[in-house]
Amino acid sequence: MGFLFGTRPTPTSIVNREDALPGRDEPILPHPAPHTVLGTPIDGPWKDGQRSVVVGLGCFWGAEKLFWQIDGVESTAVGYAGGYTPNPTYREVCTGRTGHAETVRVIYDPQEVSFEDLIRTFFEAHDPTQGFRQGNDVGTQYRSVIYAQTDDEVQKAREIAESFSHSLADAGYGGITTDISLLSDTPTKTMYLAEDEHQQYLDKNPNGYCPVHSTGVACR
C-alpha cells in the first residue's frame, strides 16, 4: 500500500535492544557551550537545590523554547533518552532504530517553580494521546515521555496524568499514552545531549518552524 499525500504510517512499536543501532562510546557533544538564552551550563555542574526532569513532547526544538521561557527554569538542553543506542546522532534517532525519544532536560529551582507546574505545562503543550507521533511528526522518537528523578515525582506525574485524562476524555480525546517512569529505569539511564546545532535551536534560528501541538484542554 502506498503512502498518501506524502504521509507515512505511524509505527506500532519501539525497536528492541537486539535490533538497535550500536552507537558509540564518545559523546556527540563533549564540550557543550553555555545556554544561548539563559547563559547557564547545559550539562552541569548544577547548583545545590536545583532539580531536573526529562520530558519528550514531540519535536524538541519547540519544546525546549517552551520551558526556557518559564520563570524558575535555570537551564534546558535537548537530547535523546529512553532507548538503547549510546551517544546516538540525530540522523540515527530519526531512523527509529535507537529506541530514543527526542527530549528536553529541564533544570529548575523548586523554590520558584514546582515539579507539578512543569508537568501541567508539559501536558497542556502537546497531545499526549497520539502515541508515536505529534501532529505531522511521525515516529517513535516523537512519543510523549516524562523521565523523573524520584519515585515521588513519578507518582505525582501519574496523578496529574490521571486527572488530565478525564478532561481530555470530556473533550473527545483518547487515552493518554505518555510513558512516565524514572530516568534511572530507562535502558541507558541517562539523556544523551544532541548536537550543538539543535541546542536552543529556535534562539539560533528565530524563523525556524517547530510548533507545539496543544489540545487546548487545561491541565489543572
From Swiss-Prot:
GO cellular component term, pick one: cytoplasm
Catalytic activities: L-methionyl-[protein] + [thioredoxin]-disulfide + H2O = L-methionyl-(S)-S-oxide-[protein] + [thioredoxin]-dithiol; [thioredoxin]-disulfide + L-methionine + H2O = L-methionine (S)-S-oxide + [thioredoxin]-dithiol
GO MF, one example: peptide-methionine (S)-S-oxide reductase activity
Key words of the record: Oxidoreductase
Coiled coil location: none
Keyword field contains Oxidoreductase: yes
Source species, domain of life: Bacteria
Top EC class of this enzyme: oxidoreductase
Enzyme Commission identifier(s): 1.8.4.11
Active site residues according to the UniProt entry: C59
GO-annotated biological processes: cellular response to oxidative stress; protein modification process
PANTHER family from the UniProt entry: MITOCHONDRIAL PEPTIDE METHIONINE SULFOXIDE REDUCTASE
Function: Has an important function as a repair enzyme for proteins that have been inactivated by oxidation. Catalyzes the reversible oxidation-reduction of methionine sulfoxide in proteins to methionine.
Family per record: Belongs to the MsrA Met sulfoxide reductase family.
Stated name of the protein: Peptide methionine sulfoxide reductase MsrA
Organism this protein belongs to: Corynebacterium kroppenstedtii (strain DSM 44385 / JCM 11950 / CIP 105744 / CCUG 35717)
